[in-house]
Amino acid sequence: MDFEDDYTHSACRNTYQSFNGMDRDYGPGSYGGMDRDYGHGSYGGQRSMDSYLNQSYGMDNHSGGGGGSRFGPYESYDSRSSLGGRDLYRSGYGFNEPEQSRFGGSYGGRFESSYRNSLDSFGGRNQGGSSWEAPYSRSKLRPGFMEDRGRENYSSYSSFSSPHMKPAPVGSRGRGTPAYPESTFGSRNYDAFGGPSTGRGRGRGHMSDFGSIHRPGIVVDYQNKPTNVTVAAARGIKRKMIQPFNKPGGTFIKKPKLAKPVEKMSLSKSPTKTDPKNEEEEKRRIEARREKQRRRREKNSEKYGDGYRMAFTCSFCKFRTFEEKDIELHLESASHQETLDHIQKQTKFDKVVMEFLHECMVNKFKKTSIRKQQTNNQTEAVKIIEKDVMEGVTADDHMMKVETVHCSACSVYIPALHSSVQQHLKSPDHIKGKQAYKEQIKRESVLTATSILNNPIVKARYERFIKGENPFEIQDHSQDQQIEGDEEEEEKIDEPVEEEEEEEEEEEEVGEVEEAEEVGEGGGVEGVGDTEEGGDVEGEGEVGAVGEGEGEGEGVGEVEEEEAKEEPVGFSVDQAEEN
């Protein structure tokens, strides 16, 4: 029979003859006679004929749905060898040409199938059954693919009578080396209509489902295959659902982990009074903080003597001087008010609070002035300290005392010469450092203000200040002496404490700030610390002034230090509670 006969007139007759046992070979899969072995015996009979007629002439189920015509024509594994050079019974998805078989003829057959567009709607190349890498296709399972009861069209199980007749999978791993055992997931290669797998094809483009192509031939309906397919689908669904289910679970696990430390913290705060372990930890923390403050005082004393405690300071502006006039001018200056405004803006403090903070600085200045008056009479001690300063210096060392100017912004000492100071003022380093130091002062002033207000002693005084009383008035001499020492040391330590907080974050910056504060006063020497708004501290005077301060410190300074040692306890406790 000629292959060029009309399709609709010859297909049924040819197939009918083949079913009657005639040993004929008609191209499309060589369904020619009953001598073909399909693995499960021969297939034929009236039912197959009816299925064929429904498929060939009715064409009522060409979308790949369920029913008796769900499966495409069946071909044996080696049927390709019996095909002719040109087969009109094969669709446009041609596998009968060697070059297409070798390079994976996906689309691109010489004849276009009328059902190509409808088949493409079922999904991508991987879903339609390409020979692309197996894991990629399995990982891209689609919900629509799993929910369709006509999914047998997509499964290679539905296209073969036995697993041994399935084509060898080909993917990125090479021929015959599937990524997963095909017995587990089922090969999703749909090069099922003749010969081994067709290779890589054209990449990851769309590819239609060959199982749904309607061609003349025997339609084999495997009734038992959907169960296996659904098992594979169930596996895929389960694997798919586990991943998104675990993600919320993972976050759930994290939440209790985050909540547990919070509970511990809350428990550790409440039973602090009763639990001895927590009390011991709190005591250790307080002792460690006190020890740190004590070491800082000792270091400053070694560097500059106790005179650094005789300086007038503004904790907010990091201003330090040994002259009363300078501190008075500073407390009334625009730079000091600007710092207070910045604190109020950042902390949203009330105006009354800002007035109280300013009064704290004024009171601190007054107490320092009183302390200096009490120590002015100790001149002999000053001479002794002065000797110690120049101890070991001989003429061969070519050393002498000179006046210097200390720049806190740059942390350098400049000779007290007009030319040297002017040169430094115009230097790029100073211009840059001046702005950076000003911003640093603003940042630290906020921390200082909050740390002062968190002190329980200051809180009590603030309550009195709100009531209109004088919070700094001496009520009980013994108590007030301790309170005054506490507050003074607290406000002096406000800077170190604040630096302690920043030490945990920026240790280097803290060191510079601390040194700038303390060295500034040492370099301030006997007396003039005119601080310009630019951040320049002109500490004019002789180094002997440091000795003078040190001598004074030996007398009352020791008493004040004893008082100061008690103060950090209250402050540290409060700070520890804060942390």
Curated annotation (Swiss-Prot):
A motif (Bipartite nuclear localization signal) lies at residues 238-260. One of its GO terms (biological process) is regulation of RNA splicing. The modification Omega-N-methylarginine is found at R173, R235. Residues 483-520, 529-541, 549-565 have a biased composition (Acidic residues). It is found in: Nucleus matrix. GO terms for cellular component: DBIRD complex; nuclear matrix; nucleus. Disulfide bonds: none annotated. Residues 154-194, 248-302, 470-579 are annotated as: Disordered. The modification Phosphoserine is found at S48, S56, S63, S69, S81, S82, S91, S106, S114, S118, S121, S137, S212, S270. A zinc finger (C2H2 AKAP95-type) spans 314-336, 407-430. Residues 272-290 have a biased composition (Basic and acidic residues). Pfam families: AKAP95 (PF04988). Component of the DBIRD complex. Interacts with CCAR2; the interaction is direct. Core component of the DBIRD complex, a multiprotein complex that acts at the interface between core mRNP particles and RNA polymerase II (RNAPII) and integrates transcript elongation with the regulation of alternative splicing: the DBIRD complex affects local transcript elongation rates and alternative splicing of a large set of exons embedded in (A + T)-rich DNA regions. May play a role in neuronal differentiation and is able to bind DNA and activate expression in vitro. This is DBIRD complex subunit ZNF326. It comes from Bos taurus. The gene is ZNF326.
